[in-house]
Amino acid sequence: MSTFIRGPICGTDNCPSRLWRIIDGRRTCQYGHVMEGDVEFNDDEDDLNGLGAGVITRRLNLTTNATGSFQSSQLTNSQLLQQQQRQSHKKFKKLIGHEAKLLFLKSFQFILKRQIRWLITEMRFPKEFEHVAKIIWLKILKTINDQPQEELKLQLHMTSTISILYLASTHLSLPVYTCDYIKWICTAKMPYFQASEILPKSWRIQLPNYYVSILEGSISPFNGQLYNKIALTCGMIHFKEFFNSEISCQGLLLKLVMQCALPPEFYFYTKQVIEFEETDIRNLTLWERTDERHTGRVSNHAELRVLSYFMLTINWMLSFDRDRQYPLKWILSLTESLTQRTTTSESIGRNIVKVVYPDKPTSSDYFQWSEEETLEFLKWMEKQFLPTQTKSLHNENGSMEMTIDQKIARRKLYKIFPLDREANHDGEFNDSTHQLTFIEDLQERYAKQTPFFESNKIRDSLNYQEANPPARKEAIGRLLTHIASQLLVDFAISKEQLKDCISRIKNACLHRMN
């Protein structure tokens, strides 16, 4: 029987003892309580030559962790993890059935509230936005509650949160569109990816793994998934019956014209084409869909119809102009400006969306980035993306479930490759270089177009000779291809979907002309 050794508090039945000794290989406090999981033996053979009898001894090894508490040196990491999991499962157990669905709805609402708070504080959305989003969410809950319990289907995903936010902004006629929400979630500014990490710890432990995976937002919406979800949400709550369903078409047109640095008159050209086909621009409203199995035609979505009108207007105006008002050199210069690599907030955001967007053909663009674009992407990866995938190194509140030993090991791991900006003296990540804003970049792009129109006025006073039609047609085709490639990424649709929508709108316009 060994002597007493001072150690951690026993705690069994509120036992205050700190004195421990070994009785029959088991660590026992002075009041007779046995410490669980702390029996260990040293089975190493002694020097048989030195011990004539060849006796094999078994010695008890006492080790302590970072806090000075006793622990077994022979317990593997998996055994320690199992002990911790058994202790945590005593407090929280996975919910099943109806209780699990209620907790999922509660968690979904918690994430939605965080997203709304971010939009109001960071993007300066009006305070009424929260009230409208709350009403839409309550209508969804009422629809779910009205279903029979035997056939209850939640039909909620992380894209459902974006749908609710988009519907609320549409009702308030805010100049915010799906491309904005896609950019915010892909750049990890708005809570979306790994959104389950912001839930309280007790909720995450009790929530079944199936629901946790839903709240993780594994990939960004693509191939028109967001538009289909918006249409389903509209049909679920009969959005048009209670809310304003007209999209801010003028704001979207202005956004497209400025993004492509087109002359301002293209805004009015496109608006006239829309009014010719739709009779009234206010007829562009959200589409409601109730059938989950059939997605319907992509041309039913109002925003995609505006994109199609915009592309058709550019094609028709430049094709019938015949080098009079918009010369061939200007078309070539505009195409070059769209492909030129500029380090602006918009270009960096589009590069990030291309990386996050699951589209294989865009992967070749990564090798064409400039050094500034690459550094900006790496900075975003460090500051925005990595914290959503793993708990931050300095965020101790987010890692309360980790033991002190695990925290110490994590710090040592991060010190192998320090990412601290202050430790880098080479100046490679220096932020002193000025980054052009969207307005400054737009002013430069418009300034470069001025000489082409001035020279065109001088040429009009002379004898006019029509430019080479095949060369002009090819240049227009390249311009439309570059504009379409940007729209595919910004609005998260496929090339086939955009082609189908443009074809249907074109046929409808030609049929109306006849």
From Swiss-Prot:
GO terms for cellular component: nucleolus; nucleus; RNA polymerase I core factor complex. Changing C29A: Impaired binding to Pol I. GO terms for molecular function: RNA polymerase I core promoter sequence-specific DNA binding; TBP-class protein binding; zinc ion binding. Residues 102-210 are annotated as: N-terminal cyclin fold. The keyword Metal-binding applies. A zinc finger (RRN7-type) spans 3-36. It is found in: Nucleus, Nucleolus. Zn(2+) binds at C10, C15, C29, H33. InterPro entries: Rrn7_cyclin_C, Rrn7_cyclin_N, TAF1B/Rrn7, TF_Rrn7_Zf. Its main location: nucleus. Although it shares weak sequence similarity with SUA7/TFIIB, displays a similar subdomain organization as SUA7/TFIIB, with a N-terminal zinc finger, a connecting region (composed of B-reader and B-linker regions), followed by 2 cyclin folds. Component of the core factor (CF) complex, which consists of RRN6, RRN7 and RRN11. The CF heterotrimer may further dimerize to form a hexamer. RRN7 interacts with RRN6, RRN11, SPT15 and RRN9. Component of RNA polymerase I core factor complex (CF) that acts as a SUA7/TFIIB-like factor and plays a key role in multiple steps during transcription initiation such as pre-initiation complex (PIC) assembly and postpolymerase recruitment events in polymerase I (Pol I) transcription. Binds rDNA promoters and plays a role in Pol I recruitment. After binding of UAF (upstream activation factor) to an upstream element of the promoter, CF is recruited in a SPT15/TBP-dependent manner to form a pre-initiation complex. This is RNA polymerase I-specific transcription initiation factor RRN7. The lineage of its organism: Eukaryota, Fungi, Dikarya, Ascomycota, Saccharomycotina.
